[in-house]
Amino acid sequence: MYKWNSIIYDKNRIMKVMIYIISLCNKIHGGEIYMFQNERFCTCGVIEEVPIVLQCMMWNMVDTMEVESKDYFQVFELSEYDGMQKIVHSQEMPEYKMEYLIKLQGAPIFVGKVYVIDDKTHSTMLKAEEY
């Protein structure tokens, strides 16, 4: 469990809520599945090593990115910068790059590369070394 904004979140509860929200989005759009709006999964490496708050932020970054179209392969480079979590979110086609600096409260800074891949039936978040 991680403390974020003075609230304690349970990993399993967060994942169930995220899946429920995605299901609602699919129903709202008449069952039509849009890129990254299908079932979502995280690999063991992500679940064990990437703080849940960062997992949720990365899913949200994919959901809210303003591009003409989303590439099936999203890249997140996470590092530490001046005591804060730095996240560089990018995709290849169409070209997209956005940098974020986040001050985390109670969650450790994660350093590494994470991919989010959509294969039209589900979306998976995995560490680069699990690819």
Task: Label every PLM stretch briefly.
Residues Y2-K103:
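N-terminal "domain-start" segment
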